[in-house]
Swiss-Prot record:
This protein's name: Large ribosomal subunit protein bL33B
Gene3D superfamilies: Ribosomal protein L33 (2.20.28.120)
Pfam families recorded: Ribosomal_L33
Chain segments annotated as coiled-coil in the UniProt record: none
């Protein structure tokens, strides 16, 4: 199956700072990663958005 684009949005401010490619298969949970948010100026949880 083809890869799909998804964004990682900051859980605090909601800005979409990162884009990733994921497999097209639906998953029950969304990806959560700790990454640096340039708008908040600190490391926060980023969640997958579609």
């Amino acid at each position: 199956m083809a890869l799909k684009k998804a964004s990682l949005a900051c859980a605090v401010c909601g800005s979409r700072n990162y884009s990733i490619k994921i497999s097209g298969n639906p998953k029950p949970t969304r990806l959560e990663v700790n990454k640096f948010c340039k708008h908040c100026g600190k490391y926060t949880t980023h969640r997958e958005t579609r």
